[in-house]
Amino acid sequence: MTIAKKPLVLLIMDGWGYRPNMPDNAVANANTPVLDKLCKDYANNLLSASGMDVGLPDGQMGNSEVGHTNIGAGRTVYQNLTKVTKSISDGDFFDNKNFVDAVDQAVAAGKAVHIMGLASPGGVHSHDQHIVAAIELAAQRGAKNILVHAFLDGRDTPPRSAAGTLALFDEKYAQLGVGRTATLVGRYFAMDRDNRWDRVEQAYNLLTQAKADHTAESALAGLENAYARDENDEFVKATVIGEPAAIEDGDAVLFMNFRADRARELTYTFTDSNFSGFERASVPNVHFVTLTEFADDITAPAAFSSERLTNTLGEWLADHGKTQLRISETEKYAHVTFFFNGGVESEFKGEDRTLIKSPSVATYDMQPEMSSIELTEKLVSAIKSTKYDVIICNYPNGDMVGHTGVYDAAVKACEAVDSCVGKVVAALKEVDGECLITADHGNAEQMIDPVTGGIHTAHTNLPVPFIYVGRNAEMASGGRLCDIAPTMLNLMDMEIPAEMTGTPLITLK
């Protein structure tokens, strides 16, 4: 006979930070009666989700990869941004074997060194100082033809802010006497993660064929031309800068993004012999190196290997015979699976996964509810099945709509999530289950840039909510994302592994 389980559900409201009420605060100004009542009736506090508390440099805003990794690990996990930056300051970066080998082979054959990545100081997917260091490394190794392919941000940075980074690159070329920016394209095309191969194809054709609708004599001129076409950084269409310079056989290609989820698709176009996303007109045989490990099935060498996290929440639950479900939309599916499991692709024993397809719209302000209704239906069904001990669910709306910078849409996104939370809590009460509600980082609570007065599309470094909907309890003040997993295990009356250095925050009365 199957024993009915009383599930503990962790709801992660992506991009939902806490900020005192302001006119541009979509979270506070949204009509959220469910969450308002939960905060009134149940134990709750705020958690730190940025900076050193999640393994990032002081003051650095959190992000979804970092947030989910810390939540799932139950400990502060020092992030790739921190590791790579330290290796540059220590000098170890310039002796990195995989980078050096690729560059040296290209130099010996008189070929080019291509450096591509998100040209941004945002620190979420990349950092422009890492690209500068790669330019320096190539120059030190004797490269005479260093070509930078700049993917423009405007999502983790202000919408029209790329000029500073492009000027930084120009200064470095002038200082070294070698190198130039060869192409520009917005991250909308180069960094898709939802199998929108028509977008990726445009970036790939720019890189491998120098195929573009636009040209310019300099990177800054190309950027200004894009702005004149009313294209913000994220959406800049493929642009060739100066003499066309496509990636060719024998060249070295260094992909300088450190975050995996939005780097995988473009990497597959270069490295997967069975690639079928689109017909590739050119498939150059290159020395391709990624900055970090993007996926188990990517064969290209990585300059920095991933830290193996043992006894994450998912692994610990599996080892103790517990069942678990991970569920989200396409946009955050990798976060509740791969990142939550500490970079492990495969499911643990007793772990099921449910993927709900995100809507096919150009930008999510066009459909701020995204696929939350279908997601909630599947989640409620899973709760009522009493099959699972633990369910991890991510609602992407606050983050994905917050990134558009459209305030009214962000308000609607928050209201949609609130309605869904109400249905989840009602289902849990039917089966005597419990719920923890939190976020991985902030976003929608700040929609106007206080400096420029323009729209704010980036994450914030503000705290996030933590609500316990369950038994009568007290909540400790303070806390970090890494405290969530130990808190969950404590609520389940389970031992906490030694590797989890987070602190349980809830005391049952």
Curated annotation (Swiss-Prot):
Gene3D superfamilies: Alkaline Phosphatase, subunit A (3.40.720.10), BPG-independent phosphoglycerate mutase, domain B (3.40.1450.10). It catalyses: (2R)-2-phosphoglycerate = (2R)-3-phosphoglycerate. This is 2,3-bisphosphoglycerate-independent phosphoglycerate mutase. It comes from Psychromonas ingrahamii (strain DSM 17664 / CCUG 51855 / 37). Keywords: Glycolysis, Isomerase, Manganese, Metal-binding. Belongs to the BPG-independent phosphoglycerate mutase family. The active site is at S64 (phosphoserine intermediate). GO terms for biological process: glucose catabolic process; glycolytic process. Its EC number is 5.4.2.12. Mn(2+) 1 binds at D399, H403, H459. The keyword Amino-acid biosynthesis does not apply. Catalyzes the interconversion of 2-phosphoglycerate and 3-phosphoglycerate. PANTHER family: 2,3-BISPHOSPHOGLYCERATE-INDEPENDENT PHOSPHOGLYCERATE MUTASE. NCBIfam families: pgm_bpd_ind, PRK05434.1-5. Transmembrane segments: none annotated. Monomer. GO terms for molecular function: manganese ion binding; phosphoglycerate mutase activity. Pathway: Carbohydrate degradation; glycolysis; pyruvate from D-glyceraldehyde 3-phosphate: step 3/5. Substrate binds at H125, R155, D156, R187, R193, R259, A260, D261, R262, K332. One of its GO terms (cellular component) is cytosol. Binds 2 manganese ions per subunit. The keyword Cell membrane does not apply. Mn(2+) 2 binds at D14, S64, D440, H441.
